[in-house]
Amino acid sequence: MSIKKIIAIASAKGGVGKSSITSLFALSLAKNFNIGILDADIYGPNQHILFNLNSIKPEIVIKQSKKFFKPLIKNNIKIASMGPILDDDKAAIWRGPMLSSALQQLIYSTDWGDLDILFVDMPPGTGDAYITISKELNIDGSVFITTASPLSINDTAKSINTCKKLNIPIFGYIENSINELESILDSNLFGDIPKLTSIKFNKKIYTMDFSDSLISSLKLDKVYENFINT
């Protein structure tokens, strides 16, 4: 197993489009790269829902006397999430050590195979998940998702500082769900952290209608190329 690049997609607040943009990054690159998504949001996993894999349980395989989960596959994207492992109507009410253990299981007990890019859909906020991910994975860089809301901006600044303290590189941030009534955020809003792109409000994103035309219009493949080669 080899993973060439590991990219964390993060947000300080829930509901800003982080998981959707993670999926759209993966879909925009899946034609030319071997892509995986690690859904690190143990308490609120969404990737299996975004890819319509709600009712599918991961297959277990034995390799060298060890059990591994086969990642679910959709659109040539490998997806590992606690969502299909737990029943959808059951919440994971776990303390920090159990959360860290679940993340380690997803990382090390998933039969990823060879990947060009692994996107990590981070949980909102900061805390144990960030510490575990930073220790267990060699993250090449992170991308933050924020809206123009002052609350989102304030919390994003805190999460950026958390990544800096954990020595997680930061590629930049994406401003999501802008409309003609909102001013576009200043490129220097977070100091030396650049703005990678702005995404206008699009109903298709909220209804999870990830059509080829939507994927093409967002040009997230070009965004990836720009920040990965900077």
Spans of model-derived segments:
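Phosphate-binding loop that captures ATP/GTP phosphates
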Residues: F33-G36, A40-I85
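Phosphate-binding/switch loop-helix module in NTP-utilizing enzymes
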Residues: G83-I133
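Conserved Switch II/interswitch segment of TRAFAC-class P-loop GTPases
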Residues: G113-T126, N138-S159
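C-terminal lobe/tail of nucleotide-utilizing enzymes
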Residues: I160-T230
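Conserved beta-strand segments of the P-loop GTPase G domain that flank and frequently precede/overlap
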Residues: S81-M82, V143-T147, Y173-N176
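Residue-level signature of catalytic and energy-coupling elements of molecular machines
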Residues: I3, G14, Q47, A80, ...
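Walker A/P-loop phosphate-binding motif and the immediately C-terminal alpha-helix
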Residues: K5-D39, Y173
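Short glycine/serine/threonine-rich phosphate/pyrophosphate-binding segments
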Residues: K18-S23, P45-N46, M122-Y130, I153-D155
